[in-house]
């Protein structure tokens, strides 16, 4: 028995033969004629001619195995040109045609009449319909990356441990020590973004939310293989660079998701955008968040609303935001971070292309999403300034003054590790219970 496609090669299967003798051998368009030595449609003829004349070079993102089909022929120009050459289209015929045309124009003695195809038969036919999605499906590697990240996002947000009354939680610890064991800063209490009562934030809640967000974010960093592969010194620097921007990206998405006109926190409290309501909030919290809130809402949350951003885009943006190369990191650390950042950027690009109607729509959406990153970085710097003032002047915020918030937010702590804090005599070794019952 003859089994269909038993002897069909991989490239033949991915690029099926034309259904008739007059079909284009490149894309299967039924209206083919002989051009440059092979049966091809006007669209592929024009594409081949322009590619050879202008010496264009293309690059395929999918191992040079893209499907070249009539409706999707414009998806990958590299594979389309390769297919043109494979079916026998002669590049020399294109070059000789151009040489002949140039010679005729220079001599001017012999008028060579060349029948031009209608304007809409080459370039217009070569356009990809706007309702055709650039990619039929994502690569399985991208699907695995996204599935893993969404699973870890859910796991970290729902990671809850019983509160240990015998344990003390402190903000007066070294950064590296806190990174290795974030549970010493705060218990992994239940995350409650969407509280029904939604109280205004207080100084006690400010302190708790800072610590719980620290623990939550470090737990999430640990889900990324690139972060786990770093040495301790690189981890410490990367946490200082990205803890605040990643946190603000997370806060913004939750404010957008739960339609809160202000900053929503992990314990269900919030800080309002409305200046009138802000008068009901304690002065320390206004000092901390007052400068940040307007930009937070106008430049980040509103952008998410306009784009109708989804959770997949948010987690990929968080990974890109976190993995920031920097000259202060080791060479190996920068290599690991740069490779990981490119991986998540490619995953985001492919995901957006899959859900968008055409390359223009996908490009616009990707640009709008990436524009969020510098804004959250600025918000992080605003918080650095606010937190330094509060951490130095408010013992209610961090117990003994200075401590972990100072080390995280102080700019000079990025450059020196040994001198980022004073002697132990300046700080009381005081452990204050953090959890607020």
From Swiss-Prot:
GO terms for cellular component: nucleus. This is Nuclear hormone receptor family member nhr-100. Keywords: DNA-binding, Metal-binding, Nucleus, Receptor, Transcription, Transcription regulation, Zinc, Zinc-finger. GO terms for molecular function: nuclear receptor activity; RNA polymerase II cis-regulatory region sequence-specific DNA binding; zinc ion binding. Orphan nuclear receptor. A zinc finger (NR C4-type) spans 24-44, 60-79. Residues 141-409 form the NR LBD domain. PROSITE patterns: NR_LBD, NUCLEAR_REC_DBD_1, NUCLEAR_REC_DBD_2. Residues 21-96 bind DNA. It is found in: Nucleus. Belongs to the nuclear hormone receptor family. One of its GO terms (biological process) is cell differentiation. Signal peptide: none annotated. It comes from Caenorhabditis elegans. InterPro entries: C.elegans_NHRs, HNF4-like_DBD, NHR-like_dom_sf, Nucl_hrmn_rcpt_lig-bd, Nuclear_hrmn_rcpt, Znf_hrmn_rcpt, Znf_NHR/GATA. Gene3D superfamilies: Erythroid Transcription Factor GATA-1, subunit A, Retinoid X Receptor.
């Amino acid at each position: 028995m003859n089994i269909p496609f038993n002897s069909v090669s991989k490239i033949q299967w991915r690029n099926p033969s034309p259904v008739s003798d007059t079909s284009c051998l490149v894309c299967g368009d039924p209206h083919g004629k002989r051009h440059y030595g092979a049966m091809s449609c006007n669209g592929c003829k024009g594409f081949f001619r322009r590619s050879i004349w202008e010496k264009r070079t293309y690059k395929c993102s999918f191992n040079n195995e893209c499907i070249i089909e009539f409706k999707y022929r414009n998806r990958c120009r590299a594979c389309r040109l390769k297919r043109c050459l494979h079916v026998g289209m002669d590049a020399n015929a294109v070059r000789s045609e151009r040489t002949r045309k140039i010679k005729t124009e220079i001599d001017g003695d012999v008028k060579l009449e060349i029948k031009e195809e209608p304007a809409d038969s080459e370039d217009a036919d070569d356009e990809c319909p706007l309702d055709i999605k650039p990619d039929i499906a994502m690569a399985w590697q991208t699907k695995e990356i996204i599935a893993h990240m969404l699973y870890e996002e859910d796991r970290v947000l729902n990671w809850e441990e019983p509160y240990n009354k015998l344990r003390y939680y402190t903000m007066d610890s070294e950064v590296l020590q806190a990174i290795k064991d974030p549970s010493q800063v705060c218990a992994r209490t239940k995350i409650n973004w969407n509280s029904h009562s939604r109280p205004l934030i207080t100084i006690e809640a400010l302190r708790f939310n800072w610590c719980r967000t620290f623990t939550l974010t470090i737990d999430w960093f640990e889900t990324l293989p690139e972060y786990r592969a770093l040495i301790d010194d690189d981890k410490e620097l990367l946490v200082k660079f990205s803890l605040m921007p990643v946190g603000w990206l997370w806060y913004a998405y939750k404010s957008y998701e739960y339609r809160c006109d202000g900053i929503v926190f992990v314990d269900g409290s919030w800080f309002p955008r409305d200046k009138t309501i802000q008068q009901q909030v304690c002065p320390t919290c206004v000092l901390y968040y007052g400068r940040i809130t307007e930009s937070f809402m106008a430049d980040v949350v509103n952008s998410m609303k306009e784009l109708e951003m989804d959770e997949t885009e948010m987690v990929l943006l968080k990974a890109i935001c976190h993995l920031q190369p920097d000259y202060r990191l080791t060479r190996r650390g920068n290599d690991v971070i740069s490779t990981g950042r490119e991986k998540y950027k490619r995953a985001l690009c492919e995901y957006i292309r899959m859900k968008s109607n055409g390359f223009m729509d996908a490009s616009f959406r990707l640009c709008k999403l990436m524009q969020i990153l510098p804004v959250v970085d600025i918000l992080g710097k605003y918080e650095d300034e606010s937190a330094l003032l509060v951490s130095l002047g408010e013992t209610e915020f961090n117990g003994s003054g200075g401590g972990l918030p100072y080390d995280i937010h102080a700019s000079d702590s990025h450059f020196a590790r040994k001198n980022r804090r004073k002697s132990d005599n300046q700080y009381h070794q005081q452990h204050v219970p953090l959890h607020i019952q």
